[in-house]
Amino acid sequence: MKKRSILCVGAMTAFLVSAPGWGEGDPARGWARAQMCAGCHGIPDYRTAYPEVYPVPRLGGQQAAYIVKSLQDYKSGARKHPSMVAIAATLSDQDMADLAAYYNDTTVEARK
């Protein structure tokens, strides 16, 4: 019985150590979500004309914390842009973390 308990504790510990933590982003899931972002953020030198003309930032290589904070601010209304507010409203905290992990891991060269 004692041997079985030790094995169970060992197996659970190994599982918990290898599993991603809550709130950590998964770049693979982020890649899938990022396909909706590519239409604007994936075009070099793209400028939007709505609601005003300005250059759309490239996201590859951005700090994960910056991306999460920006998306949270769009979702809360602290940052204003109609398209981004609408998109951020559909994202969960995990979606934001996944997107941030993907873009954080994307090389700066991919931003050019």
Where are these regions (language model features)?
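Bacterial N-terminal signal peptides that target proteins for export
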Residues: 1-9
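C-terminal capping alpha-helices of c-type cytochrome domains
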Residues: 76-79, 87-112
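N-terminal signal peptide c-region/cleavage motif recognized by signal peptidases
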Residues: 14, 18-20
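Sequence/structural segment immediately N-terminal to covalent heme-attachment motifs in c-type
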Residues: 24-48
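Short cysteine/histidine-rich zinc-coordinating motifs and their immediately flanking basic loops
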Residues: 49-55
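A structural feature that tracks compact, well-ordered secondary-structure segments
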Residues: 56-58, 68-75, 86-89
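Extracytoplasmic/secreted proteins, especially bacterial periplasmic and envelope-associated proteins
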Residues: 29, 66, 83-86, 98
